[in-house]
Amino acid sequence: MFKFLAKGLLRDRTRSFFPILIIASGVMLTVLVYSWMSGFSVMLIYESARFGTGHVKIVTNAYNELIDQKPYDLGLMNVDDKIETLSQEYPDVHWQPRIYFGGLLDLPDEKGETLSQGEVIGFGVDLFTDSFEHDLLNLEEALTAGSLPTKNGEILISQEIAEKLDINIHDVVTIIGSTMYGSMAMDNFTVSGMILFGVQAMDRGAVIVDISDVRSFLDMEDSASEILGFLPTYNEAKTFEISKVFNETYFDEDDEFSEIMIPLRTQGQMEYIIATLESYMASFIFVFIFIMSLVLWNSGLMKGIRVYGEVGVRLAIGESKGHIYRSLIYESILIGIAATIIGTS
């Protein structure tokens, strides 16, 4: 019967053209908007993970209470041992220590007097021992001038802050901050390159420094602000599962320096942002399909009037009502399948 109905639809375009056109257009627009919003959500998660949240994040209980301030004086200690233990317990997760700090970037003249000065946000990442951070942060693609650091004492600065302070490649700059214990810290660094990520928060005043230099600068030997964990591919359910197991083992609410693992979705405003995107996608699909259903319903009513005579003839020659009804349903299914294939291709 399907073959017979398919031939009929192909030969009589008036029965199939407009329904297929309407359904194909609706499917195409629904898939297009859903794919765009899904892609935006994936990119949001990707950008958040690589710059700040990781897929999971380990911090101290006290740090978590003030996490928006990034208080590295409440950070993790004995980080190398912790990462070794984590790698054994969660071999599928790649662990990276990070140090976030703020300070003043000072450009001195030949006499050591200040030429220009501005606030910067420092990122202490592992630049030398492996290439994971290079790939994660896309440093080679983000590089706009100069080269990546090849030795200790070299740093990357955002192109915007470089232009603002009139800093050139190979200039020696001074970063002024405070150590983990609250005393003043100053150290000189050589600008090896300039970067532009296309992310406003980073481009406004980011400084990328190797974590070993930051540890020496801030008196944070074998310490880190946070430890970020990255799965091979982001899996929200798995991040919650890993966090639950870790927190049941290591987290003590009464100990301010006990470690707590936080999945990406529950960090900052991510829960609200992701939930809002999901609700927008669901609402759009529901509303659009509902409107398309009304249009098709109206089209079906008009078609019913048109084929009224045809149905009467079929009944008159002895065709059963059930057979006619089933053939109309099969015809609708064929139109829906054809339109869906056209709309998604």
Language-model features, listed with the residues they occupy:
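Membrane-interface helix starts
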Residues: 9-25
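Transmembrane helix boundary and interhelical loop/hinge segments in multi-pass membrane proteins
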Residues: 13-15, 303-312
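Small-residue faces within membrane-embedded alpha-helices
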Residues: 24-35, 39, 289-292, 303, ...
